[in-house]
Amino acid sequence: MKEFDLESYDYHLPKELIANYPVLPKEKAKLLVYERRSQTITHTTFEHVLDFFPKNALVVLNDTKVIKARLFGSKHAFLPSKTTEVFFHRFFKGNTALTQIKGKIKVGDKIFFDANYYAEVLELLHNGQRLIAFYDNQTPLNQENILKLLEQYGHMPLPPYIKRADESLDAHEYQSVFAKHIGAVAAPTASLHFSQNALEKLLKDFKHAFLTLHVGAGTFLSVETKDIREHQIHTEVLHIPKKSQEILQESQEVLCIGTTALRSVEYFKRLKNPNQESFECDIFLHLANPIQHVNHLLTNFHLPKSSLLMLVSAMIGLEKTKEIYKIAIEKKYRFYSYGDGMLIL
């Protein structure tokens, strides 16, 4: 069936519609509202987004905080040029970290970030990741101090389709105003549309719940299998506090701010008897594994052949998704992380 054929999720996007910078002020970003029951499309801006939220809906937000995950170093302490890139993914066992390192690398290699701080390669993993440990003058760093190192020397991990180096504005614009728990290496991008004023109004006027899904680097990976049902999606760390779990269990109508919040809710609500607050989320939502527990979604416009485009199709159908994306391109909506948004009701 064509809805499970990977090629059905391809589309052409003119390069000029890839947003390299955010719209400021945030409220001026464009918003496409699709109402499924009436099949109507409304073109507006984020200044009016809360006017469309159903009054009785529970609004779910992902409060993960993006790490400055890109480090640049050199293979020799005395070299001033830092041309080796280390992309931090997540902590592994104890104080080691899973990373990607550009260029040739072998076990035992050291990458220096300054005269004192360096990383040592411990293992080359089959999936292209490298297991490393961080040191300060030969003293191993714990997780807390590694995060301090990343904050001091790291760069914001802008997505690969943004063809520029990170700038000072990215430190706050590629971070939601309600970001709280550090651990993501990509922003939950629908969240970026909310200013502090808009957030305060949302929290005052709507029932809401926070959860934390630490978005992983796998979020940018294309699906590669010809039949999308055979794709193995990446795993991400999910934390849902008991208070939020209780609110989710009792709520009938749910609106998620972003696909990460939606995937988290769907994963949690399908568990038989959840008795913990932390999980490993690996749910892949598509037309053969449709959305069951979320009614509405605020999201950005996603990459061709991505699992997120398949998630949107699982919510409104493949043909309707393609139709709306075609309209968005014709109307010059801006796509991807710093782009405009879409509200599905």
UniProtKB/Swiss-Prot annotation:
Catalytic activity: 7-aminomethyl-7-carbaguanosine(34) in tRNA + S-adenosyl-L-methionine = epoxyqueuosine(34) in tRNA + adenine + L-methionine + 2 H(+)
EC number: 2.4.99.17
Example of a GO biological process term: queuosine biosynthetic process
Localization terms from the record: Cytoplasm
Keywords: Cytoplasm, Queuosine biosynthesis, S-adenosyl-L-methionine, Transferase
Gene3D superfamilies: QueA-like
Coiled coil segments of this chain: none
Gene Ontology cellular-component terms listed: cytoplasm
Metabolic or biological pathway, per its Swiss-Prot or TrEMBL entry: tRNA modification; tRNA-queuosine biosynthesis
Pfam families: Queuosine_synth (PF02547)
Main location: cytoplasm
Family assignment from sequence similarity: Belongs to the QueA family.
Family matches, as HAMAP family: QueA (MF_00113)
Function text: Transfers and isomerizes the ribose moiety from AdoMet to the 7-aminomethyl group of 7-deazaguanine (preQ1-tRNA) to give epoxyqueuosine (oQ-tRNA).
Subunit structure: Monomer.
Protein name: S-adenosylmethionine:tRNA ribosyltransferase-isomerase
Organism of this sequence: Helicobacter pylori (strain J99 / ATCC 700824)
Phylogenetic lineage: Bacteria, Pseudomonadati, Campylobacterota, Epsilonproteobacteria, Campylobacterales
